[in-house]
Swiss-Prot record:
It comes from the Bacteria. One of its GO terms (biological process) is translation. It comes from Leuconostoc citreum (strain KM20). Residues 93-123 are annotated as: Disordered. InterPro entries: Rbsml_uS13_C, Ribosomal_uS13, Ribosomal_uS13-like_H2TH, Ribosomal_uS13_bac-type, Ribosomal_uS13_CS. This is Small ribosomal subunit protein uS13. PROSITE patterns: RIBOSOMAL_S13_1, RIBOSOMAL_S13_2. Part of the 30S ribosomal subunit. Forms a loose heterodimer with protein S19. Forms two bridges to the 50S subunit in the 70S ribosome. GO terms for molecular function: rRNA binding; structural constituent of ribosome; tRNA binding.
Length: 123
């Protein structure tokens, strides 16, 4: 099992898909990493040689990407910063409402949670 950036990649997936299991690496970044490391995108994770694994690890380190815990911490601190300065986005985060301008009159149930009953209102 290939272990890159502290994450065990799924053995049966293609390496380009397996890399996206690392928080902070999407499709485009995975393709760039593999191109720079000189590894084919079609290789399965289980079929990687030790040299290929090392090349991928070295490329990930060389690109200075923020991954996993560091990136999660940065996003969390950015949201806290928005809340502290009481920007519009920070207030929306604090209230648990959509942040990017979506309408909330009818939908937004994912962000707002289950509908709350209103006392005295009958159908």
């Amino acid at each position: 099992m290939a272990r890159i950036a502290g994450i065990d990649l799924p053995r049966d997936k293609r390496i380009v898909i397996g890399l996206t299991y690392i928080y902070g690496i999407g499709n485009t970044t995975a393709q760039k990493i593999l191109a720079e490391a000189g590894v084919s995108e079609d290789v399965r994770v289980r079929d990687l040689s030790a040299d290929q694994e090392d090349a991928i690890r070295a490329t990930v380190d060389k690109l200075n990407l923020q991954l996993e815990g560091d990136l999660r911490r940065k996003v969390s601190l950015d949201i806290k910063s928005l809340q502290e300065i009481a920007s519009y986005r920070g207030i929306r985060h604090r209230k648990g409402l959509p942040v990017r301008g979506q309408n909330t009159k009818n939908n937004a149930r994912t962000r707002k949670g289950p509908a709350k009953a209103i006392a005295g209102k009958k159908k």
